[in-house]
């Protein structure tokens, strides 16, 4: 991943549009939690989206705009993530331009680690994605917390494909 100033420069120039066609302003005064997922078919990602959905009201009351980014087509993102209404904005990044722009890493060993050590969670996620969840990349997730001026307050890079920023760290962001 890039250094903080490079990330700030990159995200301040991002022109994000969610899967419903709504523009997502960055640096206009709202705190933003960019939760950068793998594919929409990722079993672990589907579980995390469910957890975020359960906690979203708390975060939204604190004036945090949550933006979930998926390295998937809009149709896959709608089918696997947005089949139920989500209380946050969802961005499809099918060509992985955001991932490349942030220099996020991939790791087969980190994927294998999650599969071996998080088997119950994997099986739970597969119940949501079906067999499509078995064919995913080695891309690792990341979370970036931005203040209202697009200044990076926290970067969390995943240790494996099931890993995301702990909710307790997002609490400190409030």
Where are these regions (language model features)?
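N-terminal "domain-start" segment that seeds a small globular fold
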Residues: 1-27
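Short loop/turn microsegments at loop-to-beta-strand junctions
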Residues: 11-12, 31-33, 140-142
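Short active-site neighborhood of thiol/selenol oxidoreductases, capturing the structured segment around
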Residues: 25-52
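Short beta-strand/turn micro-motifs composed of small residues
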Residues: 37, 70, 147
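Structural microenvironment flanking redox-active thiols in thiol-disulfide oxidoreductases
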Residues: 48-101
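Thiol/selenol-based redox catalytic cores and closely related redox-interacting motifs
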Residues: 93-162
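A short, polar/charged loop-to-alpha-helix boundary motif
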Residues: 161-174
């Amino acid at each position: 991943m890039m250094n903080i100033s490079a990330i700030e420069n990159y995200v301040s120039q991002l022109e994000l549009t969610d899967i419903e066609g709504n523009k997502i302003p960055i640096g206009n005064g709202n705190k933003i939690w960019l939760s950068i997922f793998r594919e929409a078919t990722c079993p672990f990602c589907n579980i995390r989206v469910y957890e975020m959905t359960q906690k979203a009201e708390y975060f939204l009351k604190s004036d945090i705009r949550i933006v979930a980014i998926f390295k998937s087509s809009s149709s896959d993102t709608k089918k696997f993530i947005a089949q139920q209404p989500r209380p946050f904005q969802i961005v499809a990044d099918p060509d992985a331009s955001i991932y490349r722009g942030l220099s996020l890493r991939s790791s087969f060993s980190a994927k294998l680690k999650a599969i071996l050590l998080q088997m119950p969670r994997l099986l739970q996620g597969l119940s949501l994605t079906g067999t499509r969840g078995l064919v995913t990349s080695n891309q690792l997730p990341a979370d970036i917390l931005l203040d209202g001026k697009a200044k990076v307050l926290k970067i969390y890079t995943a240790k494996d494909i099931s890993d995301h920023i702990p909710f307790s760290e997002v609490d400190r962001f409030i």
